Curated annotation (Swiss-Prot):
L-methionine binds at residues 57, 100, 240, 271. Residues 100-110 are annotated as: Flexible loop. This is S-adenosylmethionine synthase. The gene is metK. The keyword Repressor does not apply. It comes from Pseudomonas syringae pv. syringae (strain B728a). Its cofactor is Mg(2+); K(+). The lineage of its organism: Bacteria, Pseudomonadati, Pseudomonadota, Gammaproteobacteria, Pseudomonadales. GO terms for cellular component: cytoplasm. K(+) binds at residue 44. Homotetramer; dimer of dimers.
Length: 396
């Protein structure tokens, strides 16, 4: 991190319009995978005042009540009356999902599952850093925690005047690659019209900001921007149109690592935009957890219909205990990055995806979930179960 003395990342809440769209897309994916785990799904969502539109391509034997899924997601987030500007019970729902192209299917499907081709060409990145306990960059970690806490305070009634839409931004100061302070915090939260700015600022500072940001990182010159425009009453899909896939930096590393451009939500694991990015995080996190490097960024790339990656590249930014070339060899020896192998390695054919669609896909804690008769672990790409093998293979 020596190239930056300050670095800023942002996050958004589950009630942000783009995140509503992401959660709807992944809820549709989950419902289909729960019935047909080998389904091919690409679901896009648009939300605006009074309407939610879902579109895309699906190949499945399952039947799911798409309208009910869409409404439940919106209601669960907290948009349940015209007073907050959007109501999942009464909004219009339009479904224009079609079938997957047979040209794509013939390029992906194989008689031998392990030969499954990539669902599209593309490049994906994975990243890890030892600057936080979850091996993620601090600015995006704190940003996620702020909007998560906002949702907790809203839903629990701790701050009853909060509404679902919110955004956060955190600027961290670095010295020699380590976080030594937080220079600026921005938190904008939707609220009802009855709360005064004084009460809002005090409540947010005491029960959200100070609850999240470690006190030793705050200093006399830290800037706090709480609802800097004053009022934030109109929010959610009324304030802005929401679309699936528009928060790809929020979803990943907050700009600290590069991004191949592909979004995650609404895509089944045959789409390497999603599964290979998860695998990249898994590889990078295990490299850092093994002590092979303090920071690691990995890039993989694919050609449509081809199983083997077209490239695997790696950068430890001068923090590696071994050369990057030697670490790449360890990656090739210990991780199979073909699409089917990724799906198997990370056990991705379960309805786990709506949980990923807000507050970041990375830096989360692996958790056991049960949906119907299916019990599985979500966020498997956050496990560090390959670290010991990597350390041993490296001779450390």
């Amino acid at each position: 991190m020596s190239e930056y003395s300050l670095f800023t990342s942002e996050s958004v809440s589950e009630g942000h319009p783009d995140k509503i769209a992401d959660q709807i897309s992944d809820a549709v994916l989950d419902a289909i995978i729960a019935e047909d785990k080998y389904a091919r799904v690409a679901c896009e969502t648009l939300v605006k005042t009074g309407v939610a539109i879902i579109a895309g391509e699906v190949s499945t034997s399952a039947w799911v009540d798409l309208e009910d899924i869409v409404r439940n997601v919106i209601l669960d987030i907290g948009y349940n009356s015209s007073d907050v500007g959007f109501d999942g019970a009464t909004c219009g729902v339009m479904n224009i999902i079609g079938k997957q192209s047979v040209d794509i299917a013939q390029g992906v499907d194989r008689s031998k599952p392990e030969d499954q081709g990539a669902g599209d060409q593309g490049l994906m990145f994975g990243y890890a850093s030892n600057e936080t306990d979850v091996l993620m960059p601090a600015p995006i970690t704190f940003s996620h925690q702020l909007v998560q806490r906002q949702a907790e305070a809203r839903k629990s009634g701790l701050l009853p005047w909060l509404r679902p839409d919110a955004k956060s931004q955190v600027t961290c100061r670095y010295e020699n690659g380590k976080v030594v302070g937080v220079d600026a915090i921005v938190l904008s939260t939707q609220h009802n019209p009855d709360v005064s700015y004084k009460d809002l600022r005090e409540g947010v500072m005491e029960l959200i900001v100070k609850h999240v940001i470690p006190a030793h990182l705050l200093h006399k010159d830290t800037q706090f921007h709480i609802n800097p425009t004053g009022n934030f009453i109109i929010g959610g899909p009324v304030g802005d149109c929401g679309l699936t896939g528009r928060k790809i930096i929020v979803d990943t590393y907050g700009g600290m690592a590069r991004h191949g451009g592909g979004a995650f939500s609404g895509k089944d694991p045959s789409k390497v935009d999603r599964s290979a990015a998860y695998a990249g995080r898994y590889v990078a996190k295990n490299i850092v957890a093994a002590g092979l490097a303090e920071r690691c960024e990995i890039q993989v790339s694919y050609a449509i219909g081809v199983a083997q990656p077209t490239s695997i590249s790696l950068n430890t930014f001068g923090t590696g205990k071994l050369s990057d070339d030697k670490i790449i060899k360890l990656v090739r020896d210990n991780f199979d990055l073909r699409p089917y192998a990724i799906t198997t390695m990370l056990d991705l054919l379960h309805p786990m995806y709506q949980a990923t669609a807000a507050y970041g896909h990375f830096g989360r804690i692996p958790v056991e979930m049960t949906v119907g008769d299916d019990t599985f672990t979500a966020f498997t790409w956050e496990k560090t179960d390959r670290a010991d093998a990597l350390r041993a293979a490296a001779g450390l």
